Amino acid sequence: QKSEKELKISVGHDSRITAESLKEAVGIGLRSLGITVLDCGLSSTPAMFMSTVFEEYRCDGAIMITASHLPKDRNGFKYFSREGGLDKEDIAQIIKIAEGLSLEELQAQYKEKNALGQVKQAGVMSTYASYLREMIKKQVGGDNPLEGLRIVVDAGNGAGGFYALDVLKPLGADITGSQFLEPDGNFPNHQPNPENKEAMESICRAVIENKADLGLIFDTDVDRSSAVDASGREINRNAIVAMAAALIAKDFPGTTVVTDSITSDQLTEYLENCLGLKHLRFKRGYKNVINKAKELNQNGVDSQLAIETSGHAAYKENYFLDDGAYLATKIVIKTAQLKKAGAGLDVVLSSLEEPKEAIEKRFSINRADFADYGQEILCRLEEWVEREGQQIGASLVSPNYEGVRINFDNEQVKGWCLLRKSLHDPKLPLNVEVTKGSCSDIVRVIDEFLADFDVS
C-alpha cells in the first residue's frame, strides 16, 4: 500500500462552465496531502480511466469532473481506480468521509501538513487518440485507412470533438459536415445525449445533407455513443446494442451479451437467432450490466459485452470500460472494411426487426415513501397479471430482473411493457413496444390498474 505522497491521481473535465473551478478545488485538496496531480484538462471519461492503464502515466486513480448529459448547471465527479469505476458502495463511503469533515478541519490539515504535491500537465487525450488511431490502422490497414470515407461527428459541444479532429481526420477520413465539435458548456445546439430525439434528428440530417458514409454522436463526456448509417437510419437504443454485439459475434460465438431491462423481443431474436449469441436482459444502470457481465465471467460463463440501450457499451477486451469512442472506433473499422468490399453498414443490421411503435411514459409517485410504495405497486401488478391477465392475453415474462415485464398477445395488440422503479426519482417509468396494434392499447391497461394508487 502506497503512502499519500507516493500517489499519482489524474484529474480531467468535460466542457461544463464550472469545470475549471472544480478542478482547481480538487487539485488543492489532493496536493494538500502530498499527492501528485496530473492535470488532463478537457478530457473524456474513458480517457481518464485509461490514464491508469497507459504506461507513460500509470496513475493510481482518476477523477473526471462531469455530469454527463444533465443540465448545464449540474456537475459532479466520477472516480476510477486501476480496477475501473467505483461502485455506489465506494461512493457512499466517500460521501460519509466528506460529511464528517468540517471546513475548519480541512483548512487546519492543509496548514499543518504543508505537504504540497506537484501538479503536472498531462497529454492523456493525445495518448488516447493515438491509441484509437492505432486500433484502426491495425484492423483496416495502411497509413490512411479511412481515405475515401466521409464520417460526420456530432460532439454536442461536449468533450468529443477530438474524435473527428484527432482520430478520424489524421487517418484520411473526410469529416465534412461534422458539427458542434467546439466545447461549450452552455450546450447551445442540442442536448449532448444519443437518446435525445432532437440530437438524433440533428446527426441524421447532417449525414443525409453531406452524403456521409457514417454519422457518430457522443454524449458530453464520451462514455456513450450512437451512430447513423448512410441511409439516415438511427443506430441507437436496440440497434446500437445489436451493432455492438454483431461486431464481436464471429470472434466470440455463443458469448452472453448482458443488457439493460428495456430491450425489445426483436433484439433478443436477432442476438440469439441471427448472431448465435446468448442474451441476458438484466437491469437499468450501466454499472449493473457491467458488474453482471463480470460476475458471469467469474462463474465460468463467457460474457464479452455489457451494454445499455442508452449507449453505454463495455467490452471485456477493453477492461469492461463503457467507452463511447471505443465503440465508435469499432463501428468505423467495420464501415471501412465494408466500404472496401463495396457494401455499407446497413448490411450488418438488415435482419434486425424494429417494433411498429415504442414509447416511454413516466408516472409520478405522490408519496414520501416512494421507494417502498413503488415496490408495493409492482408486487400488486404482478399479482393482478397472474390472477386476471389471461382474460386479456397478458402474461408475466420470466426470468425478469427488474420491475414487472408483461407480454400482450390478443386480437388487438401484440407487444410488451415493463413497469419499473426509477433508479433515482419518485417515478415509475413504463416502456411499451408493439408489433401489432398500438402502444396506447397497453398503456390503457396500465392506466386502469394504476387508477387505484397514488400516482399521476
Walk through the language-model features, giving the residues of each:
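Short glycine-centered, acidic/aromatic-flanked micro-motifs in structured strand/loop junctions
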Residues: 11-13, 81, 153-155, 229, ...
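Gly/Ser/Thr-enriched, mixed-charge loops and adjacent short helices
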Residues: 75-207
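A short, gly/pro- and small-residue-rich
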Residues: 72-99, 228-244, 318-329
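Phosphate-binding and adjacent anionic-ligand microenvironments
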Residues: 252-431, 436-456
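Proline/glycine-rich low-complexity loops and linkers
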Residues: 40-45, 95-130, 229-309, 313-315
